[in-house]
Structure formats: structure tokens, C-alpha cells
Amino acid sequence: RSDRDWSSDVCSSDLLMVKPSLLYMDVIARLREATLLPIACYLVSGEYMMLRHAVAAGALDEKRGMLEAHLSLRRAGADLIITYAAVGIARMLRER
């Protein structure tokens, strides 16, 4: 949808949700520039499994890759990240 389409939908919103989110960081960044509403990102099960399979195949370092995938959403403008990896990410952040 174009920016004009979604802007009329946010009038009474408490937050904006982007899901799936990993492939839509450009949308998150545009939303961040356009609104003061909190932006929530939901890494859906398919995105989580894509990361887990990359780790299992040796294509992605678990700690660095999982952490970067989630921190990149924050850099794009997300205020809240909903993820199946929440416990693991919390552990990684605590160890940093």
C-alpha cells in the first residue's frame, strides 16, 4: 500500500505493527519518519525458522546472526520486537 493509504488508518491507532518484518525494514524506516506512534515488529515463524536453518547449516553464527537480525529492526525504527527468539536474545543482551 502507498503511504497515503496507510496514513488514514492510523488516526486512532495505539501502535503500528509490521509483520513479517525482516524484509520490510525500509517500511519500518519510512513509518518511523512519518509517525510518532510506537512501531512494533513481529518476526513471524517463517522468519525465525529461516534464521534457525541458517544457523543449523553453518551459514549464520547463532549469537552474532540472531542478535544482528533483531538489532537491525531497532536501527530501522522499531520500538518493540515480538519474536520467538525472545529468551535467547535476552540472554545474549545480558551477556554483552
Walk through the language-model features, giving the residues of each.
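Catalytic beta/alpha-barrel core
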Residues: 13-22, 81-85
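Short, flexible, glycine/charge-rich loop motifs used to bind or transfer phosphoryl groups or to couple energy/partner
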Residues: 1-2, 30, 71
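Active-site pocket-lining segment
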Residues: 13, 23-26, 45-52
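Single conserved hydrophobic/aromatic residue that forms the stacking wall/gate
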Residues: 1-11
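Active-site-adjacent beta->alpha loops and helix N-cap segments on the catalytic face
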Residues: 20-41, 87-96
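Active-site-adjacent loop and "lid" segments of alpha/beta metabolic enzymes
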Residues: 33-76, 95
